[in-house]
Amino acid sequence: MAILGLGTDIVEIARIAAVVERSGDQLARRVLAPAEWQQYLTHAQRVRYLAKRFAVKEAAAKALGTGIRQGLAFAQFEVANDTLGKPRLILHGRAAELAADLGIASLHVSLADERRYACATVIAEG
C-alpha cells in the first residue's frame, strides 16, 4: 500500500467557542453527521468535541486533495471510535465516492487536543 494523501488541521478551541456563543448549535448542525450530533447533545465538553471533529474533517478533506468543496460537506465525514477509543473515519456520499475514485482503501486518523487547540492528521492509504 502507498500513501495517497495526507492532511493536517489545527483548530483554536476558543474560536469554535466564540462561534457557538454567537450562533448556538448552527455550526454543529452543519459539521456533524447524525450519529455525531447525538453524541454532541449529551457530551460534557461540547465545544471541545465539536473542535476535534472539525479538525478531523478538515484534515480528511485535505487528505482527499480537495478541502471542503466540489460537492463535499463536513457531515459526509463521520468520526467514530473503536472499542478502545481510537478515532476512525466513515465516509458518506461524495466523500466516499471520491475516496473510491482515488483508490483509497483506508484512512488513518490521529487526533490530539490540549487546553487551547485541537489537532488532527489523516493519512489516506491505497
Swiss-Prot record:
Keyword Lipid metabolism: yes
SUPFAM superfamilies per record: 4'-phosphopantetheinyl transferase (SSF56214)
Molecular function per GO: holo-[acyl-carrier-protein] synthase activity; magnesium ion binding
Keyword terms: Cytoplasm, Fatty acid biosynthesis, Fatty acid metabolism, Lipid biosynthesis, Lipid metabolism, Magnesium, Metal-binding, Transferase
One matching Pfam family: ACPS
Enzyme Commission code(s) on record: 2.7.8.7
Cofactor needs: Mg(2+)
Catalytic activity: apo-[ACP] + CoA = holo-[ACP] + adenosine 3',5'-bisphosphate + H(+)
GO CC entries: cytoplasm
Any one biological process term the GO annotation gives: fatty acid biosynthetic process
Entry-linked Gene3D superfamilies: 4'-phosphopantetheinyl transferase domain (3.90.470.20)
Sequence positions that bind Mg(2+): 9, 58
Subcellular location: Cytoplasm
Enzyme kind, highest EC tier: transferase
Tree of life domain: Bacteria
NCBIfam families: acpS, pantethn_trn
Role of this protein: Transfers the 4'-phosphopantetheine moiety from coenzyme A to a Ser of acyl-carrier-protein.
Family: Belongs to the P-Pant transferase superfamily. AcpS family.
Record-given protein name: Holo-[acyl-carrier-protein] synthase
